Amino acid sequence: MTPDDPRDASDASLADATADSASRGHGSFFGRRKGHKLRAHQAELIADLLPQLSFDLAAPPPADLRALFEPGVDQVKLEIGFGGGEHLVAEAEAHPATGFIGCEPYVNGMAKILAQIEARGIRNIRLFAGDAAELLAWAPKASLARIDLIHPDPWPKRRHWKRRFVQDATVTAMARALRDDGEFRFVCDIDDYSAWTLSHLTRSPDFAWTAERARDWQNPFAGYTMTRYGRKAEREGRRAAYLHFQRNAA
């Protein structure tokens, strides 16, 4: 690999996007940032396209997050940890008047969604390669219509539970960023983490669990696009829980 190899630039671009977050010690909710070696075009997308779709948390947020997008966007939704981007891309294509922010620190996942954005000409996705906790703190109050957390890292060992994204502090942060009647959707095939999330959200005065019967959490949300991780869980005999919460009026 030569000094001019775009794969060097891709690492530098992602490092720039995440260094500020890491320096403040909030990088504990996610694990590795990079897996297999990027192909040349993937590296070019990280170096060239990602900066066009990213935003800088060092700058003050816009008063309205819709300003991050082209005119015509009427609401903004956030997906935390989008993995390969299957769900986020499907949502963006199905709802062109909604702006979507995708948060993913894993460089290979970022490369995958950038390739889809380029190939499909998607214009209503913005990307953030750092820590979602930092993003929630930066976002204006009541600026999001929905937050999705789909198949997050379950951190199954008890000593690692503090690294799970769902914590009392992040529940409070999500409540601040969501508008009244905004939604939080959680999908997980690990029963322990689903129970953990249900416990944290139902004890919060800011959220109400909307399920009225078992099928409300046993079946996917209407229009839901299964992710690669979801299909893998099904093949291995694990059934996901689909938890839907609504932000109570402040």
From Swiss-Prot:
This is tRNA (guanine-N(7)-)-methyltransferase. SUPFAM superfamilies: S-adenosyl-L-methionine-dependent methyltransferases (SSF53335). Pathway: tRNA modification; N(7)-methylguanine-tRNA biosynthesis. Keywords: Methyltransferase, S-adenosyl-L-methionine, Transferase, tRNA processing. It catalyses: guanosine(46) in tRNA + S-adenosyl-L-methionine = N(7)-methylguanosine(46) in tRNA + S-adenosyl-L-homocysteine. Belongs to the class I-like SAM-binding methyltransferase superfamily. TrmB family. Pfam families: Methyltransf_4. S-adenosyl-L-methionine binds at residues 79, 104, 131, 153. It is an enzyme of class 2 (transferase). It comes from the Bacteria. NCBIfam families: tRNA (guanosine(46)-N7)-methyltransferase TrmB (TIGR00091). The active site is at 153. GO terms for molecular function: tRNA (guanine(46)-N7)-methyltransferase activity. The gene is trmB. Its EC number is 2.1.1.33. It comes from Rhodopseudomonas palustris (strain BisA53). Residues 1-10 have a biased composition (Basic and acidic residues). Substrate binds at residues 157, 189. HAMAP family: tRNA_methyltr_TrmB (MF_01057). InterPro entries: SAM-dependent_MTases_sf (IPR029063), tRNA_(Gua-N-7)_MeTrfase_Trmb (IPR003358), tRNA_methyltr_TrmB_bact (IPR055361). Catalyzes the formation of N(7)-methylguanine at position 46 (m7G46) in tRNA. Residues 1-30 are annotated as: Disordered. Residues 11-24 have a biased composition (Low complexity).
